[in-house]
Curated annotation (Swiss-Prot):
GO biological process, one term: translation
Name of the coding gene: rps14
Gene3D superfamilies (alphabetical): 1.10.287.1480
Keywords tagged on the record: Chloroplast, Plastid, Ribonucleoprotein, Ribosomal protein, RNA-binding, rRNA-binding
Protein name: Small ribosomal subunit protein uS14c
Family listed: Belongs to the universal ribosomal protein uS14 family.
InterPro entries linked to this entry: Ribosomal_uS14 (IPR001209), Ribosomal_uS14_bac/plastid (IPR023036), Ribosomal_uS14_CS (IPR018271)
This protein's record includes keyword RNA-binding: yes
Subunit text: Part of the 30S ribosomal subunit.
Any one cellular-component term (Gene Ontology): chloroplast
PROSITE patterns with a match to the protein in the record: RIBOSOMAL_S14
Function, in words: Binds 16S rRNA, required for the assembly of 30S particles.
NCBIfam families in UniProt: PRK08881.1 (NF006477)
Source organism of the structure: Cucumis sativus (Cucumber)
Length: 100
């Protein structure tokens, strides 16, 4: 189980990313439309003004049961070992065990 503070920090980052998403997107569109390099640098400076944690690259997927940050399966939102336990217990419909 991940520490609760790390899970809360990740939730805070998600809220910030949603809050500043449109601002970042509009600034990036402006950069692509402006022909002169000096104006691009000015817009790039504005792009750096939102908080760092509002950048989408700082988000990290976590298992929604345990909060584990590694080995997550996007389709299920679970980490690998929790996914395996749930499949063995037949708690995930449509998921089958395989061996090769």
């Amino acid at each position: 189980m991940a520490r609760k503070s790390l899970i809360q920090r990740e939730k805070k980052r998600q809220k910030l990313e949603q809050k500043y998403h449109l601002i970042r997107q509009s600034l990036k569109n402006e950069i692509s439309k402006v022909p002169s390099l000096s104006e691009k640098w000015e817009i790039h400076g504005k792009l750096q003004s939102p908080p760092r944690n509002s950048a989408p690259t700082r988000l990290h997927r976590r298992c929604f049961l345990t909060g584990r940050p590694r080995a997550n399966y996007r389709d299920f939102g679970l980490s690998g070992h929790i996914l395996r336990e749930m499949v063995h217990a037949c708690l995930l419909p449509g998921a089958t065990r395989s061996s090769w």
